[in-house]
Amino acid sequence: MKQYSVGNQHSNYRSLLFPFLCSQMTQLTASGNQTMVTEFLFSMFPHAHRGGLLFFIPLLLIYGFILTGNLIMFIVIQVGMALHTPLYFFISVLSFLEICYTTTTIPKMLSCLISEQKSISVAGCLLQMYFFHSLGITESCVLTAMAIDRYIAICNPLRYPTIMIPKLCIQLTVGSCFCGFLLVLPEIAWISTLPFCGSNQIHQIFCDFTPVLSLACTDTFLVVIVDAIHAAEIVASFLVIALSYIRIIIVILGMHSAEGHHKAFSTCAAHLAVFLLFFGSVAVMYLRFSATYSVFWDTAIAVTFVILAPFFNPIIYSLKNKDMKEAIGRLFHYQKRAGWAGK
């Protein structure tokens, strides 16, 4: 009976010890696998022979237009003395940000469309996320500064020249960059410390917080917290700009001169269109929380978010802007004359 009880105890020990050792081995294996994740794979891109080239050419043309249009806007404002005002200073900053903003994602998209290697290193992914969101937040801050500029110009025109001096414009721009590049830094630093396990496939066309965090060995509530932080940032900027424009519209409607109505509305219409375009695409992209879409619509929303505002901003600011059209015409006329003189 004693021998039987001892054997039974050994059997009990083994039944308790074996699962414990298995769990420890599983954790060690998982830990080893986590350290092996050195790159992420983009799973949303088609192969080159399955339609990748079909998407490559339109995206390349769109990227070329974004670079050319925003670069022309930036150069025209810098060289045109008549455009050296706070309004056009912020437009030139916005154009420069659009160039940098699209360059963080579109070149990698183009590479993935024609290459069989659709991967990005972990460090490269973190850098892409950092610059993409930093530039996006900076752009929203610049749009806020532009709304404040229009608010002062229309609601307090007599004090406008003494308030919106070049020094203040530079300070607002530097402050926008400071906020943009500082706010995202803690999140990127936190993500860089997370262990990644299991699949390394990112179900998106660029590195973004939610797709990357879904691959980490962490609780999903962290993803919800990050989403809530981003939503608060977006809503705060939106409210500041929206309230400014509501006040502007009230003041414009109170003007007695029809000419004053037309001039004020034409001045603010372009900025209001850019504001709605930017925050509309941001809202569709980030204020959906747990809502899910099909692969097609998810990709379409991401592409639209990346290219929509940068593509239309040069068109909006130059289409009905007399000063901008005249400045662009003078620039090209000067280039044409310089070319003839060179010949």
From Swiss-Prot:
Write down the glycosylated positions.
N33
The primary location reported for this protein is membrane
Gene Ontology biological process terms in this record: detection of chemical stimulus involved in sensory perception of smell
Per UniProt, what is the membrane topology?
Multi-pass membrane protein
Note the PROSITE patterns from the entry.
Answer: G_PROTEIN_RECEP_F1_1 (PS00237), G_PROTEIN_RECEP_F1_2 (PS50262)
Q: Which residue ranges run through the membrane?
A: 54-74, 83-103, 128-148, 168-188, 225-244, 265-285, 299-319
The organism is: Homo sapiens
Q: GO cellular component terms?
A: membrane; plasma membrane
Tell me the superkingdom of the source. Answer: Eukaryota
User: What keywords tag this UniProt record?
Assistant: Cell membrane, Disulfide bond, G-protein coupled receptor, Glycoprotein, Membrane, Olfaction, Receptor, Sensory transduction, Transducer, Transmembrane, Transmembrane helix
* Ranges in the topological domain labelled Cytoplasmic: 75-82, 149-167, 245-264, 320-343
Family per record: Belongs to the G-protein coupled receptor 1 family.
Q: What high-level taxonomic lineage is stated for the organism?
A: Eukaryota, Metazoa, Chordata, Craniata, Vertebrata
Name of the protein described by the UniProt record: Olfactory receptor 6K6
Q: Show the InterPro entries listed in the entry.
A: GPCR_Rhodpsn, GPCR_Rhodpsn_7TM, Olfact_rcpt, Olfactory_GPCR1
